[in-house]
Amino acid sequence: MIFSNFYELISMKIEDAYGRLLTESQMTDDLKEMAQELPTIEKQNGRYQCFRCGSMIDQKLWKLSEEVLYCRACIQLGRIRSDQKLYAIAQQDFEGQEVLNWKGTLTSYQQEVSDGLIKAVKEGKNALVHAVTGAGKTEMMYQVVATAIKSGQAVCIATPRIDVCIELYGRMKEDFSCSISLLHGESDPYFRTPLVIATTHQLLKFYQAFDLLIIDEVDAFPFVDNPMLYKAAQNAIKKKGTPFI
């Protein structure tokens, strides 16, 4: 389920719901007053599609009754059914802060890439960084992440693999002074922070949450050629947000 245990459900603060995609069972009356209602399952060209994960619904097998469909593809996140709604509470800006502790130096080439990423964010353009292992991709994104957080924006760095996610979290904790959430299948409950480190599957739990979404190792399993995770990334970024890969 999206909330991995009972403690997370009862302890969630309202601000922790900002930018999250929530099911009917996760809502309280207070949250519903603030939330935007979204469809669970939409009809597209005569077929039914899950709003959360984008999967096409098997109308013969994925049904609770003759009138009610559900999505089996993302049921591990909490069952959604066609006679209910999904809910999203708009993400709010953070208080801007200086967060970069890293004192290292980029090479001229790395600095050129770093400057290009900052420019892309300012211009609202997508960017692709392709480099071999050990080329310093992580350090090259430090300045654009710090710039976004200084502006009060929400940033997520997502990667397909849990081990990479955990390693990246450890490095960012040393080099950034802000609070950071780590999200994967076995992580602690989510709390709202300006910087989130997550596996790409965790993006299914967000809706228009991030101003800057960086997907690391985009060519790795299980992200590559996975329409569900492409849909998750599409949903997780704000309409005017910037995706990097």
What feature does the model see in each segment?
Residues 122-146:
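Walker A/P-loop
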Residues 153-154, 179, 192-195, 209-212, ...:
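Loop/turn-to-beta-strand initiation segments
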Residues 204-244:
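SF2 helicase catalytic motif II
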Residues 39-93:
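Interdomain "pre-motor" coupling segment immediately N-terminal to P-loop NTPase/helicase cores
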Residues 102-125:
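N-terminal pre-P-loop "Q-motif" helix
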Residues 1-57:
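A broadly conserved sequence feature marking short terminus-proximal activation segments
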Residues 171-207:
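Inter-Walker segment of RecA-like/P-loop motor cores
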Residues 153-161, 183:
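Conserved RecA-like ASCE P-loop NTPase motor core of nucleic-acid helicases/translocases
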